[in-house]
From Swiss-Prot:
Source organism (scientific name): Paraburkholderia phytofirmans (strain DSM 17436 / LMG 22146 / PsJN)
Annotated cofactor note: Binds 1 lipoyl cofactor covalently.
Superkingdom as given in the UniProt entry: Bacteria
Keywords: Lipoyl
GO BP term (any one): glycine decarboxylation via glycine cleavage system
Task of the protein: The glycine cleavage system catalyzes the degradation of glycine. The H protein shuttles the methylamine group of glycine from the P protein to the T protein.
Cofactor: (R)-lipoate
InterPro entries hit by this protein: 2-oxoA_DH_lipoyl-BS, Biotin_lipoyl, GCV_H, GCV_H/Fam206, GCV_H_sub, Single_hybrid_motif
Family: Belongs to the GcvH family.
Designated name of the protein: Glycine cleavage system H protein
Residues in Lipoyl-binding domain copies: 23-104
Entry-linked HAMAP family: GcvH
Residue numbers carrying N6-lipoyllysine: 64
One Pfam family from the record: GCV_H
Amino acid sequence: MSIPADLKYTESHEWVRTEADGTLTVGITDHAQEALGDIVFFEVQELGKTVTAGDTVAVIESVKAASDIYAPVSGEIIEANTAVADTPDSVNSTPYESWLFKIKPAADATQDRLIDADAYTKSIGA
């Protein structure tokens, strides 16, 4: 199982990459896609909306289960990955390239929900 050291993570199995412009790119971890199984559907429900850290932003469905995807920080959901919506199984094969949405953090947003790769590895017992 892959857990890249250059990303941040949430306890709810999202990975987070900070871009040069300060926006955050969000996807689900390798561990999450393994637990879900074959992913068949993805939809961002809050595109263009301002959300609070921990709010449900999207849903991802597999042949086994449906799972909510949460905002890692407070901010505005500025983009959804339409390529993943068209081919959701790409999350199974390339979870760290198949990002789900981008969020522009609010000016007062904290990243206290985010943990590093070592802490995430421990949290999943890997």
